[in-house]
């Protein structure tokens, strides 16, 4: 299995372990496999047995082995077993599913059983194991420079804290996360963790990360890598839970020919890009539904064909803050597939985004056939919608949603008439992370799992930084210890 960039057809292909440590391609593009492995009905039936008899980690090893041929199978199985286990995850099923409304055939896939109570743990725990394994094999070290709007950073830090040969510099938008999210990250005092509060919004943080990566000399000197969703290994980890969710819902419904609709709360287009890849592999997903909040860049594209990024000033601070994103960093992967893997067109479009802030595919043949060929729908949700869905789901099902999952449930119900068959909303986080919104919706404080008791009372450490790449580089020079 070889990997190619979305931008340069002449560039040499790379192996999985090479791109694992690299993040962005040298030309600024994103990596994708040369071809997507194709799943047969027989393979899915066999995986049903693997999941039922041996568990989630065994399924993960099966799926990953289709994409990774430069890690021995036995080692890959060990990596998955260490990543997906209790008590790292609080539920032995790792990703259980629940039907929250039999009348609506509405399901939740529970992705928040990891150490930071967010779906990002699903990919990060695997990434931590992969990084440590490959760096150990090479006798090398890595500096992870990442950006987070809330959940990615804490998931990365909890997965990478204390690991040999790894340092983490994580950028956050100052004042844009909840107190719980800040406490989760800033209370980690490990020597290899550096938390940074940037004077700006999430996209400013992401731009700084990209600027560091584009400086080839600095990147090489400081062994810069990525854990943001531009890293292919993260997407690959997420593909597994779409397959697991489909298998579990098929088993519970008894429908051998199940075609499942998935609704994905979306900002960076990483989570739903994994659903797109699973669908391209032949997993029977009927529709892929993008659910956005008021920052509806993605919803606007699927409705109009125009992808128009927002400025920092036009990015709204909402009650589903992890989706307060104005530029979807993974979107390029889907556009590459949408355009028949035409890297020259893809490169030109995203160069246009960089210079003009938008591109328009509304008059193209590809956009006209987008829904037919790729199964996408999209809709957006508001603060009042979130409150209403949290309240309704609590009253009807006695299940407490977080605000991002509530965006997904709102969109699922909004588009229900267009979606035939069961609908699974991909849960993003536990409500404990968003106390203020939960109290507003249902009038009580969400229960705090024992592992998070008094987290906001712990000592915190964070470095404040302006929106300046040179300041970030100087911070890396002063804080990172280059050693294995």
Model-derived features with residue positions:
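PLP-dependent amino-acid enzyme catalytic core
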Residues: 1-484
